[in-house]
Amino acid sequence: MSDFQWRFIDFALQYDVLRFGNFRTKAGRPSPYFFNAGLFNDGFALKQLGQFYAQAILASGIRFDALFGPAYKGIPLVSTIAIALAEAGHNHPFSFNRKEIKDHGEGGDIVGAPLAGRILIVDDVVSAGLSVGESITLIHAAGATPCGIMVALDRMEKGKSECSTLQEIKNKYDIPVISLITLDDIIAYLHTRQDLVHHIPAIETYRTFYGAKVPDTVNHTGRSTSV
């Protein structure tokens, strides 16, 4: 695990984005932990979040021309990532979609730069792949090419098959998926925290029931991959 991944977990705990206890996922599964990126909800948090994503994107080595954030959570996310990348010397155009198509003014369903070239989709946590499919459809319709997906957390849970949800997306659309951190990273972090280590058995039990059974080839930042 890279230093910035370690710091990101610290950061997520500080803002209660990552919590441990008894929760239920969107899929209806009881879960011993919860990750809600919507709680990065002040100026400092949003700036830091963009910097973490930018570091992860650059560390992955993925080649892209522009960024795209699916509405609604992807709108502030893609904006802060674009700023962080520019501050690091990598200036890229960005855009996002409207949920409701505008029929006046500039019109259309895309706000920001025109979709062109290789487009990197950025999101928080992909649970069902719905926003990903919609984003890919929009990108193709504009004549651009989706070249990858960047998310904050890979829960490493099986989706509709024995593969993880992110692996299913990778297989379906034949594009790389990058995660800032994984459940493995969270567990490794917990092993270093005496005040939190007691949560590990519940997480391991959860993985026994819901963890992906097929080896994952998703690009977890800091690990080598071909993109």
Curated annotation (Swiss-Prot):
Keywords: Glycosyltransferase, Magnesium, Pyrimidine biosynthesis, Transferase. Its cofactor is Mg(2+). One of its GO terms (molecular function) is magnesium ion binding. Pathway: Pyrimidine metabolism; UMP biosynthesis via de novo pathway; UMP from orotate: step 1/2. Belongs to the purine/pyrimidine phosphoribosyltransferase family. PyrE subfamily. Homodimer. This is Orotate phosphoribosyltransferase.
